[in-house]
């Protein structure tokens, strides 16, 4: 069953496509159900005989696999690009490895292309676009009959424009066709109101050959020394100490909120596995890795 916002957004997307406009940008808060929305739009386009095939692109293999399962379930068919399949779910990275025959074959069909987490791809023109943005601009954009861009966090730390996005002016606000905010999601009970407690190391020391330097926070350490952020987060003692602080804080919070959980943002999957091992073996916590 669709949520109200998904039903509303799908209807607006179909209306725009049927009005001979080919692109739709949906910004919805993380966890709201954007993949199910995209699959529903694809289902309606197929039912209306407006498309023949569906292609989905996303940042990681795990996300691409999740999209494949959702589309296969919603469309009641295989979604692996094989014989008899209605489409395929791929990563942005894989675009550059698809041969010319693949693209020539697609020109014979009406294709609906879904770009998940589109903010990972930057550039309004080939010049200045990042690698993924260039692939979209050069190979995908002109091929698609209809495109759907999805993002939970539609901004970039480098301030570059998001590929296929429209802005009010060169330095202006991103224009989207549909927005489902965290505030709306909380009101609809789609998401819970986040209550976040941050943990920082309030007493860091660096021991050199001649002196011992102390700092009141990680930020102060980074500003006043040549120490890199990477060297801190991969340091075994630092990791164990901060994870210990976090576990103690979580234990105190759970006295009032038994369902509270802890979140550790890792630098990579390998880093996450190392953190998970410390949490399980040294702090006796249950821990799962998500990407």
Descriptions of predicted regions:
Residues 29-32, 36-42, 53-58, 65-68, ...:
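Conserved C-terminal RecA-like helicase domain
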Residues 64-104:
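Inter-Walker segment of RecA-like/P-loop motor cores
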Residues 64-69, 96-99, 121-124, 156-161, ...:
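Switch/connector loops and helix/strand junctions flanking conserved nucleotide-binding motifs
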Residues 159-260:
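Interdomain helical connector at the RecA1-RecA2 junction of SF1/SF2 helicase-like NTPases
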Residues 1-27:
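Conserved pre-motif I regulatory segment
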Residues 11-18, 32-49:
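Walker A/P-loop NTP-binding motif
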Residues 60, 90-94, 117, 150-154, ...:
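A short beta-strand-to-loop transition that corresponds to the Sensor-1 phosphate-sensing loop
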Residues 104-149, 153:
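SF2 helicase catalytic motif II
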């Amino acid at each position: 069953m669709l949520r109200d916002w998904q039903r509303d957004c799908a209807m607006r997307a179909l209306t725009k496509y049927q009005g001979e406009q080919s692109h739709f940008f949906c910004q919805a808060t993380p966890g709201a159900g954007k993949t199910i929305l995209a699959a529903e739009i694809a289902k309606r386009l197929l039912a209306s005989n407006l498309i023949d095939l569906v292609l989905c692109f996303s940042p990681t293999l795990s996300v691409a696999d999740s999209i494949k399962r959702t589309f296969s379930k919603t469309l009641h068919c295989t979604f692996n690009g094989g014989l008899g399949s209605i489409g395929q779910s791929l990563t942005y990275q894989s675009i550059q490895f698809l041969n010319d025959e693949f693209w020539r074959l697609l020109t014979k069909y009406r294709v609906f292309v879904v770009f998940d987490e589109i903010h990972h791809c930057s550039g309004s023109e080939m010049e200045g676009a990042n690698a993924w943005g260039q692939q979209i601009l050069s190979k995908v954009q002109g091929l698609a009959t209809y495109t759907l861009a999805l993002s939970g966090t539609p901004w970039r730390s480098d301030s570059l424009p998001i590929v296929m996005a429209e802005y009010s002016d060169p330095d202006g606000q991103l224009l989207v066709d549909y927005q489902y905010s965290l505030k709306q999601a909380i009101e609809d009970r789609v998401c819970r109101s986040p209550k976040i407690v941050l943990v920082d190391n309030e007493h860091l020391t660096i021991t050199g050959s001649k002196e011992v330097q102390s700092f009141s926070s990680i930020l102060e350490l980074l500003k006043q020394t040549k120490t890199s952020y990477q060297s801190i987060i991969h340091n075994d003692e630092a990791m164990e100490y901060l994870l210990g602080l976090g576990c103690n804080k979580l234990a105190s919070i759970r006295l009032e909120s038994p369902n509270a959980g802890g979140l550790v943002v890792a630098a990579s999957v390998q880093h996450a596995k190392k953190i998970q091992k410390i949490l399980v073996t040294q702090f006796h916590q249950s821990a799962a890795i998500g990407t």
